[in-house]
Amino acid sequence: MKTKEKIVQESLSLFNENTFEQSTTNLIAKKSEVLEGSLWYHFNSKQDLVSVHTELFLDSFRKKRIYTEKNDPKELILGLLSIYEVLWDYRYLVRDSFEQFSNENPKLCEKIVDINHEIDEWAKEAIIHAKNVGVLIIQDEDIESVVEISLIIGRHWLDYSMKKYPSKSNLYLRKKGINLLIKTLYPYLSNESREMVDSIYESD
């Protein structure tokens, strides 16, 4: 792995685990096994790393969201759950406060706000589409609540779970989060979709 790629990867891991604010450049360099001068050679600031992470997030998010627009029930369901995986991988972007960027780097601050708005809009569109193709049997008045609960899990389970289960692995916490999302959607799944979800997770 190239030095720049390693710095991007290790900084993402640190920001997720420790928050952006508490991850110092010295810590990033140490975790990346490079001198701090090498870090500065590739990136002028931690904000530059956030900018790279936002691009990587959007690339993954937009590739996965295509599947949530499919009419095939299995592709749609797996697509919905795969978005959660992307949110987990870049969780600090939807968890941390970046108010300090509003003056220091307004363009980056606006980009993070736009990302969060895009996630909100996608969640509602995905639930409505799932209803329209028969994956979900849900009343219009319940859509907003299901969307909001799903977003709360997607955004805040990530941080809460690590505090509640500090000794558990990331894999365990990811799976538990997915199970919470399934439980949120399960009462609204069509019979066919329930059988599909049951078979997928029985095989796992």
Feature-to-residue mapping (PLM):
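Short, basic, alpha-helical segments at the C-terminal edge of helix-turn-helix-like DNA-binding modules
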Residues: E55-F61
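C-terminal peripheral helix-coil segments that are non-catalytic and often amphipathic
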Residues: D159, K163-D204
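Secondary-structure edge/capping motif, primarily at the C-terminal ends of alpha-helices
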Residues: R65-T68, V94-F101, A130, G134, ...
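Amphipathic alpha-helical segments used for helix-helix packing
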Residues: W88-C109, K124-I128
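N-terminal positioning helix adjacent to the helix-turn-helix/winged-helix DNA-binding module
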Residues: T3-E10, V146
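Amphipathic alpha-helical packing segments from all-alpha helical-bundle domains
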Residues: P106-V133, E144-D159, K176-P187
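Helix-turn-helix
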Residues: K6, L14-V52
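Hydrophobic alpha-helical connector segments
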Residues: R65-L93, E110
